[in-house]
Amino acid sequence: MSWQISIGSILIAILTSTQACPEPASQPLTATQGDSRPAVDLELVIAVDVSYSMEPDDLAAQREGYAKAIVSQEFLRAVRAGPAGKIALTYFEWSSTSDQKIVVPWRQIDGPGAAEAVATEITNAPIRRGSRTSISSAIKFAASLFEQNPYSGPRRIIDVSGDGPNSNGDPVTSARDTALQQGLVITGLPVMTNATPAAPTDFQHIDHIDWYYEDCVIGGPGSFVVPITNRENFEEAIRTKLALEVAGLTPKQSPAPSTDKEPRVLCTIGEKLWQERWGAITPASNGPAMSKPAASSPSSKEDALLDKKIKGICRGC
């Protein structure tokens, strides 16, 4: 079940719940006994899809949404409400198995000044696009960033955004399960601004990317998704999602993720759709009936041979 409640009502709830919170402790806290790193309330990795399935307007709206969310009143109040009154954040963009680029390295946010600096880093970076969609590699890359974090917090969240299923690299459920075993939480921002395929070449379009994220991508205590259904909704949805993550809140209507239940959307649908387009296999189904493992993704050599062709004709890469 997707989250359909009013984003505005959630923002009001966040503001109300944090207004009565005490000021953060004046002395530095240590998140883990014996850990000498500066303490924060949350370690947050933001993983942003820049594959060719994302329209240029959506890429721009996504960038602007994160930059504005980080300096918003709701986000900063949620930050101040924590025991340490600060969080650590890093922001990277991803597409294929080998394409992850850090836009903002680990930064501490403890007030408007630090937030403005991070927002400026995001907006000043050139907008780019990449081929293929490897959510699994994005999750693995995000998990590795926590080991490089100069700050230490009791909660670690990977915030993944995207508009298509995994079609490259390891199965997304494998990467998800490994991250959950490491104590990480994965939340999702499925982008649904294109409700129908824009062209015959949009071969990786699926009707319910929100279901896919709920059943195949997110996981861990308090994980949730906030779908974006129109371009005008980017800023508000991202602001709400980040404030919820920092405050440690979960929408009441958000599904309780379970890695044991039968998914409503085949978790290997992206790999199957890719093979149908570039290889010869049996047509895929968008439902859970097809439970056989997907054929392996095209090799790196095949990827390279197809790359120019993909960039020219394919939105769903």
Residue ranges of predicted features:
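Bacterial N-terminal signal peptides
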Residues: 6-18
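VWA/integrin I-like adhesion module and closely mimicked acidic/polar interface patches used
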Residues: 79, 165-215
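C-terminal "exit" segments of structured domains
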Residues: 225-293, 297-298
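DG-centered beta-turn motif at the end of beta-strands
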Residues: 49-50, 142, 154-168, 175, ...
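Acidic, polar low-complexity linker/tail segments
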Residues: 20-45, 51-59, 152, 180
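Von Willebrand factor
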Residues: 38-103, 114-161, 188-201, 205-209, ...
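Von Willebrand factor A/integrin I-like adhesion domains
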Residues: 191-252
